[in-house]
């Protein structure tokens, strides 16, 4: 059995490698650039940025940028070439000239600023005009999207590596922004408005996809022994090359073409499709983050959106997935989580309020990457202490203080028998005191422990607290 499954995996990986080789051989360019480089693009500022392409094997390539940088290289025996361009602080527009003999390519309207990769499933893919009314204040937002220094590149949803050549960078205006990821656009807009510098977004997202599809085969194999046995066995099944949820397929087709483009960090909105295997999610997300950083060889920031409340089915426990996401903050360095416990829609897994999703992701970047003196997160469970018949809960990220919106509902406590009961909660000295007459000797506490829940705990900055269980610190 083991030999057979290893054979299937070998065939799958061989197909991907051969398909990439066939695509390269079919183009046979005298000089070409990777499609991720085009007019209107944004380079990461103050960075050494790779720029790559193909040409006749053994020929000389010269790249000259109008900000004063020049680089030369010779193509390898396969015709591949990569140069490194050092960028100054933000600015532009610039142009870049690439020459090989008599062949020449010129990139125009190139900006230098901050570049972020946006990835995930449908709530990241969700376009500004996905459907009528799909975004709060949709018509107003599209009509007023006039930001010449916000640019986006959409990696096409393509399992065969064919469509990427049809893509290019787009400037944010009412005509182009309709095809922008709403979450990523509002993230970029917040950064741009606060810093007044160019912002570039590389959007590589696909609705309904699981985290395993975005993780490399090597990393999944490394994680195999640490995750649930039923889940691990799925690694060994024959691969379906037409399924975007096939393990590692989006890593190969949607992520790898962007590596090693110079980026500042990653924003990630995914998890709804992994609710059924919530018990593995913290391991999988931690592993994927570390894997991506290894692929880029950069310890970049990684900020993710906690999935929003939604009714799901009675058999699913999305609160467990939310808590798995929260746990990643404690095990994976340079991560942050945008808490969305107040913007869920009971009947729609896709919240219309993408503005606050983008803004809360941007708060993390503004504080942690750009040094803004702001509160960047809602309250996060820190610890609890058993008092005389009640539990006192402490939180990080309380900002200017804790507040309740309406009744401070959603808290439950349990004794040593593990049976939870609704509890009364009140804020005292920026801590939450929780008690129930039905639990004489409380041991554990949890908050927002439902598929759908409307947040009641906030900090004074208006950011909601995360659901949590003290069993999973």
Residue ranges and their predicted role:
Residues 1-28:
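Bacterial Sec-dependent N-terminal signal peptides
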Residues 25-473:
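Cell-envelope and extracellular/periplasmic
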């Amino acid at each position: 059995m083991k030999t057979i499954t290893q054979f299937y995996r070998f065939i799958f990986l061989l197909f991907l490698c051969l398909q990439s080789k066939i695509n390269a051989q079919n183009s046979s360019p005298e000089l070409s650039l990777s499609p991720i480089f085009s007019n209107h693009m944004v380079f990461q500022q103050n960075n050494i940025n790779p720029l790559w392409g193909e040409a006749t094997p053994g020929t000389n390539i010269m790249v000259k940028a109008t900000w004063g940088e020049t680089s030369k290289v010779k193509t390898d025996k396969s015709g591949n070439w990569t140069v490194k361009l050092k960028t100054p602080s933000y600015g532009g527009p610039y142009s870049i000239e690439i020459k090989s003999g008599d062949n020449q390519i010129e990139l125009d309207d190139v900006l230098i600023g901050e570049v972020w990769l946006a990835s995930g499933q449908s709530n990241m893919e969700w376009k500004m005009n996905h459907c009528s009314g799909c975004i709060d204040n949709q018509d107003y937002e599209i009509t007023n999207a006039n930001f010449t220094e916000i640019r986006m590149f959409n990696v096409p949803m393509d399992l065969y590596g064919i469509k990427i050549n049809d893509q290019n960078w787009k400037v944010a205006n009412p005509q182009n922004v309709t095809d922008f990821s709403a979450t990523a656009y509002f993230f970029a807009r917040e950064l741009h408005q606060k810093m007044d510098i160019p912002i570039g977004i590389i959007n590589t997202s696909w609705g309904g996809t699981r985290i395993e599809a975005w993780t490399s085969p090597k990393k999944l194999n490394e994680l195999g022994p640490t995750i649930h046995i039923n889940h691990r066995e799925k690694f060994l099944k024959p691969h379906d090359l037409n399924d975007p949820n096939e393990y590692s397929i989006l890593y190969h087709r949607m992520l790898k073409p962007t590596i090693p483009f110079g980026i500042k960090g990653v924003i990630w909105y995914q998890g709804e499709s992994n609710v059924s295997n919530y018990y593995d999610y913290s391991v999988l997300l931690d592993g994927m983050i570390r894997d991506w950083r290894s692929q880029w060889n950069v310890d970049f920031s990684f900020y993710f959106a906690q999935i929003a409340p939604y009714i799901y089915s009675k058999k699913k426990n999305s609160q467990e997935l939310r808590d798995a996401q929260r746990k990643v903050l404690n095990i994976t360095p340079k991560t942050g989580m945008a808490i969305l416990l107040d913007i869920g829609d009971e009947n729609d897994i896709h919240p219309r309020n993408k503005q606050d999703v983008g803004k809360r992701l941007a708060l993390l970047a503004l504080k942690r990457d750009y040094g803004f003196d702001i509160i960047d997160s809602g309250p996060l469970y820190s610890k609890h202490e058993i008092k005389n018949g009640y539990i006192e809960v402490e939180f990080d990220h309380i900002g200017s203080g804790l507040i309740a919106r309406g009744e401070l509902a959603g808290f439950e406590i349990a004794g040593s028998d593990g049976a939870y009961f609704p509890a009364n909660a009140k804020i005292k000295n920026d801590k939450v005191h929780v008690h129930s007459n039905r639990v004489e000797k409380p041991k554990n506490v949890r908050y927002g422990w439902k598929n759908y829940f409307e947040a009641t705990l906030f900090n004074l900055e208006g950011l909601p607290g995360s659901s949590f269980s003290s069993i999973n610190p």
